[in-house]
Design a protein with these regions (language model features):
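Conserved CoA-thioester-binding segment of acyl-CoA-metabolizing enzymes
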Residues: 1-60, 378-384
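Hydrophobic/aromatic residues within transmembrane alpha-helices
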Residues: 59, 72, 132-133, 188-189, ...
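Glycine- (often His-adjacent) and acidic-residue-rich active-site loop
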Residues: 61-102, 155
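Glycine-rich beta-to-alpha active-site loop
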Residues: 110-154, 177, 181-182, 186
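Gly/Pro- and small hydrophobic-enriched strand-loop and loop-to-helix capping segments
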Residues: 136-159, 193-208
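Contiguous mid-protein beta-loop-alpha structural module that forms a pocket-lining wall or clamp
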Residues: 161-163, 168-224
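Amphipathic alpha-helical blocks and their helix-capping loop/short-beta junctions
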Residues: 200-286
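Long, low-complexity C-terminal extensions of enzymes
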Residues: 265-281, 286-384
């Protein structure tokens, strides 16, 4: 297979059109999303959007383990540690600014894409991978799907638009997922509105064949969507999806995080002694996670309960860059992915010890509103 970071193909359809296929091509890193991948994807999506022969787009990952396991945080770590040695010293964040700006712009583009865009969410779909998947017209999950937003383990928070879409879940569920980095299966994704259809992995080639044979009518937006839906209808098997993990525990989850502040929610989860293995794993992940991140999870969900998706991305860009400059992100990545000692030295011992000023400082924008890199997001064609 080619060593290009993203592979592009166009499948001819029976109606004389073509289906654009984009494949993330870094299986050794579980298709971790690099800046080069982001640039190539957006450029091709822009071209396909105005190419009348393209009737639909299919996005997938290479290999059999992951669609995309997240953003390329190792590259970010290396740039930050090369540009500013001391933790919390105000690192030079040029790559971070460039990367997050491009990533969020691409994610927003997918949310607002004018043609039906399908995401084959097979295997691991985490962090930046979920950012690519969340805005798809049809988000397809399989028996191997594992979705999570585990940013609390590296001193970050659920970004990639999660500040907006986690708020669209049942009360408390988004906060719980963000605090614990809980892993979700296909049924959970369907139950929580993070996926649209369950299709067994073995049917991938059959689904693509059905899409090439579909009727796309007059190629209006409605006709393109109808053609895709009809093709997918033939292969959906929702009844065979694995049993969910969230819905059986939703009352318990809501009792843990409902009507409280971040330190109280964290304390309740850590004091819980669940017999269920999934709940216990979530508790353990929070116990090892970044205390400052717990506050960021909570604060971002509060700030974006009623805002637009574009506003959420703008706020996330500020927070993500500041986490790289001043927060625990570098230490979290070091402990988990570089030295792999899994013993991060967080800035604060627990959530109750995090002062309000430490949280507020990370929300101070390094740009004026006129200089914000995503100031035009949502206002024109390029931003969706």
């Amino acid at each position: 297979m080619s060593d290009l970071p993203v592979l592009f193909d166009e499948l001819p359809t029976a109606c004389g059109g073509r289906i654009g296929v984009a494949t993330l091509n870094a299986p050794k890193s579980l298709n971790a999303l690099s800046l080069e991948m982001v640039h190539q994807l957006e450029a091709k999506l822009d071209a396909w959007a105005v190419d009348r022969s393209i009737v639909a787009v299919w996005l997938e990952g290479s290999g059999d383990k992951a669609f995309c396991a997240g953003g390329d945080v190792v590259a970010l770590y290396r740039s930050l540690t090369e540009e500013g040695e001391n933790r919390g010293s105000g690192r030079d964040s040029l790559l971070a600014e460039t990367y997050f700006t491009a990533e969020y712009h691409l994610d927003h583009r997918i949310h607002t894409y004018p043609k039906p865009l399908m995401v084959w969410g097979d295997g691991i779909v985490m962090g930046g991978g979920l950012g690519l998947m969340a805005g798809g017209f049809q988000r397809l999950v399989t028996e191997t799907t594992r979705i999570a937003m585990p940013e609390i383990t590296i001193g970050l928070y659920p970004d990639i638009g999660a500040s907006w879409f986690l708020n669209r879940m049942p009360p408390g569920v988004g906060a719980y997922l963000g605090l614990t980095g809980a892993q979700l299966n296909a049924r959970d994704a369907l139950d929580l509105g993070m996926a649209d259809r369950f299709i067994p992995r073995e049917r991938r080639s059959l689904v693509l064949a059905a899409l090439t044979e579909a009727n796309y009518g007059d190629r209006s937006g409605a006709a393109l969507r109808a053609g895709v839906q009809a093709a997918l209808d033939r292969h959906e098997e929702r009844a065979t999806a694995p049993a969910g993990q969230v819905w059986p525990h939703i009352d318990h989850i809501q009792a843990l995080v409902g009507a409280v502040d971040a330190p109280t929610a964290v304390a309740r989860i850590l004091a819980d002694a669940p017999e269920d293995r999934w709940l216990a794993a979530n508790r353990a992940r929070l116990a090892d996670g970044c205390p400052l991140s717990a506050h960021l999870v909570w604060r971002m969900l509060e700030r974006h309960a009623h805002t637009s998706l574009a506003d959420a991305f703008r706020d996330e860009l500020v927070l993500s860059v500041q986490c790289c400059r001043h927060g625990d992100f570098v230490e979290g990545v070091r402990a988990l992915l570089i030295d792999k000692d899994k013993s991060p030295r967080w800035s604060h011992p627990d959530a109750a010890s995090v002062p309000e000023e430490a949280v507020q400082a990370l929300f101070v924008s390094p740009w004026s509103s006129e200089e914000h890199p995503l100031r035009d997001l949502g206002l024109g064609h390029r931003g969706g």
